[in-house]
Amino acid sequence: MASPNLVSMLFCHFAKSTSVRDISNGLRSATGNLNHLGIKTAPSKSSISYQNGKRDADLFKDVYFKLLEQLGQHTKERRIKLKIKVSVYLLDSTLISLCLSLFDWATYRTKKGAVKMHTLLEYDGKLPVYVNITKGSVADNKGAENIPLEKGAVIVADRFYNDFPMLSIWDSKGVFFVIRHKENLKFETLQERELPPKGAQSILKDEEIVLSNPLSKEKYPKKLRRVAIWDNENKQTIEMISNNFSWAASTIAELYKQRWQIEIFFRDIKQLLHIKTFIGTSENAVKIQIWTALITILILKYLKSIAKYNWQLSNLVAFIRLNIFVKINLQFWLDKPFEQPPEAPKNYYQGVLF
């Protein structure tokens, strides 16, 4: 049996409801059609507000990771550009702006409020394996201190994760990293590596270095690999450090280019679902809305993966929004959204979603 609170919040995202009134009225309008969702009646406005304020957001976090365990393997895509076989994770954070007068706990700047979603995205499935929701004022590297570390995997991140004590811990755990380094990085070159002929136009530098700043060197005394590439699309040089010395420079460059996938994930969850504005003002309510958005996008990516039709995620969300209370054979609709479904056999019963 599904929780009415979970069903309400999933409806909030699928229907892009802007208030508890919209959620309650929307579900009430589906009288008789809620049984397949695992609830008997639509919750009231006060019930939704109370549950969002009092029910521990970690319950929804647990639901997300349980579903990820069950459905995550289905969402994995075949690698095309990346030739390495190790696990790849993309690390970044995104800010969600809030009105400080309404969300006074969400400190960010003097007159601005925000929460920050620190995220470790699994590359093949494009789904988070770690999310830490904090106040907007928490630095990116601090929000990533407890990310899971998988030996032999590689973590790709931007310059905000130039935290040498943290990188030293990753290295000690057998984790590779590809990090864009800051422009003011102080280092000494130990050895210039030969540039590949085919990559000479985009790969500008491949060298082994040690940090020369005494404080930084104390935090990360081992040698590093530094690769500089030319980003022709944005007309800029990108300089990266890594602790992997066996991959081709072109592999390190391609790994960093794939970091864009986490930006796409953040764009999708903000534009397609409902986390730009919030139906509750407490920290718990905000976290519940974010975790249920993650549950929703996991369900969407699973549906996309089992469909024969080549859905774009945005189109799938739009079609579900238009047909949210239409009784359909889900698999048939996913496979052939523009065809009339066959007539349901007698004594046919709709399955339970949860």
List the model feature ranges, each with a label.
Residues M1-D22, G26, G53-R55, D62-K66, ...:
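Single, function-defining residue in the core of a domain
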Residues H36-A57, F65:
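Major-groove recognition helix of helix-turn-helix-like DNA-binding domains
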Residues L71-L82, L98:
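Long amphipathic N-terminal alpha/beta scaffold segment
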